[in-house]
């Protein structure tokens, strides 16, 4: 039996050693993802209900609906619309649904939930909205849904665009 374990002794100076320090992240947590045309976007994590990887046959097509709608999905007893986010933003490249799984980001505001199908999920990152710039070289079809963009490299060739989930949810494009 040990009478004085090492963790009970000491002056408490260990807590100030650099390897024990936890850096607090700057900014807000965002989900990064790609559309079929390989453009990278982000959504604020607080507005995301969940991210789902599912088989395309779980999305029920709706006849005579807008081409940007892939169909509906039963999400824990709630039926939600699922859209090809790239086409919703005006991209001509449609999402390939002939694959084993599709990534769907379920966004929510108040009681409204919509699924946004994307090509690939990039991960979660802490991003500082204070460094957000005005979007440049964007199509008119995408402009109403952007809050801004971050330039990711010094050449300003690679950007990450922040989407406005409220504008997406309230868009008249859902009407067809």
Segments and roles (model prediction):
Residues 1-176:
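An acidic, low-aromatic, low-complexity terminal/linker signal
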């Amino acid at each position: 039996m040990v009478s004085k374990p090492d963790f009970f002794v000491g002056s408490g100076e260990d807590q100030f050693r650099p390897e024990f320090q936890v850096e607090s992240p700057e900014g807000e947590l965002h989900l990064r993802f790609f559309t079929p045309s390989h453009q990278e976007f982000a959504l604020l994590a607080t507005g995301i209900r969940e991210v789902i990887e599912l088989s395309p046959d779980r999305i029920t097509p709706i006849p005579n609906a807008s081409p940007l709608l892939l169909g509906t999905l039963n999400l824990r007893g709630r039926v939600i619309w699922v859209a090809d986010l790239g086409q919703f933003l005006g991209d001509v490249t449609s999402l390939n649904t002939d694959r084993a799984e599709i990534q769907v980001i379920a966004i929510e505001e108040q009681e409204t939930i919509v699924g946004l199908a994307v090509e690939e999920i990039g991960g979660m990152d802490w991003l500082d909205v204070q460094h957000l710039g005005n979007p440049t070289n964007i199509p008119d079809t995408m402009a109403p849904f952007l809050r801004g963009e971050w330039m990711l490299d010094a050449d300003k060739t690679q950007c990450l665009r922040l989407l406005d989930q409220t504008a997406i949810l309230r868009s008249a494009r859902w009407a067809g």
